[in-house]
Amino acid sequence: MDDSDYLRLLTIAAEQANAFLSNARKWERERWVCQRLLQGLNIPYRADEFAPAGEPPDVLFRDANFEVFFVLDEGRRLNDEWRDELQRRRSAFSLSQLVRREAKPKRILANEFLLRLAQTLRKKAHNYTERGMDLGELDIIAFASLKREVLDL
């Protein structure tokens, strides 16, 4: 495989990431998060055990009513960076044009992260309560994808 073949594969991967992060594939993305959680907990599952639900919950699985939300670095939006990365890869003529240095992530304490998460959960709880939803019926999953910060455990 030469550089141009690899560059083409990188571009295809960015196209796939953009498609996966699109609104059209929201449920598929939320189901993927649930599957990653179940794998991490070593809980076996079959694809046919997942079903879309009304909003909320996002995903039904057995007796669980999963409500999924994403936790990103401040200022990051779910698909923006992949949209930009796709343009970067499409306009590159060589792999060397794709090389860039990333800033070293800042270490944050778990308590700091949990406080941030709690603030988001309070807002969500308020919104769900206003809509007449029973919070005890939801199984919340927070999927954290941090680039600028890393947990100091």
Residue ranges and their predicted role:
Residues 52-60:
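Beta-rich nucleic-acid/ligand-interaction surfaces
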Residues 59, 64-70:
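Conserved catalytic cores of phosphodiester-cleaving nucleases, focusing on short active-site segments
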